[in-house]
Amino acid sequence: LRPLMRVSLPGIARSGPGFAFRFSGETVPAWPGETLAAALTSAGHLALSTNGPDERRGVYCGMGACGECTVLVNGRSQRACMVAAAPDLVVEPMPRRAVPTPAAPTPAARHLACDLLVVGAGPAGLAAAAAAAGLSVIIIDERSKAGGQYFKQPGTGFALTPAALDGQYREGAALIGNVAASPAQLLAGRTAWSAQRDGERIVVETSGADGPARITAARLIIATGATEKPWPMPGWMLPGVMTTGAA
């Protein structure tokens, strides 16, 4: 049986035409709003990397935590579950021993400041931001949309009928809407990789597609959520074996 990682739920319909990208020289069909992991798995490509002569790896957690779905995207190492599929991408399996390539010069970090920095735009992070009345707030999240795993929102390539969606989606959409209507600034697709004290303030270094940013805040809330803790067993890392978060 071929596992499918494509959305098929009441109230969610595809919008826009499909497209294709290349994986190991083959054409892989994809749709707007889905990740490389979803498109590759649905096309039957379960093994995405190798960890030894006879040890292959594939999509496992589906939420960017384990790194098992790492592939080369236009020559760069990326997690397939965290990269949106796009036309004309060239994707290759991650080799066991990758050849390092020179990195492009990193631009200077832009500087941002706020009263409160929230790391994580899931339920807890959004609730904290919504409750911070009167403060300047910045929220960062490595995903392209707020909501986290619990309030995960459909991708940008879908037409939605809110009345037909479940209560969990509507609750999350309402919370996200409240934060969007507030003065809080949401920086999606941004990862925090360092935090240090500077006197009475905290300096957090972040990276994103639009370059690095250094955020200075008086207070910091870490609301990075939870990840699954699978139970090891024989065959648990075989390509096609996934946690519930991915499946």
Spans of features found by a protein language model:
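Terminal leader/tail segments of proteins
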Residues: 2-17, 36-38, 42, 47-50
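A short, compositionally biased
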Residues: 12-19, 63-69, 196-202
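FAD-binding core/adjacent interface of flavoenzyme oxidoreductases
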Residues: 54, 76-114, 171-247
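A basic, amphipathic helix-loop patch mediating RNA/tRNA/ribosome contacts
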Residues: 36-74
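Fe-S ferredoxin-like electron-transfer domains
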Residues: 2-12, 52, 59, 68-131, ...
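Beta1-alpha1 glycine-rich phosphate/pyrophosphate-binding loop at the start
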Residues: 114, 121-174, 178
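Short helix/loop capping segments that flank catalytic or ligand/cofactor-binding pockets
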Residues: 39, 148, 230-232
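Short, contiguous acidic and Ser/Thr-rich linear segments
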Residues: 26-34
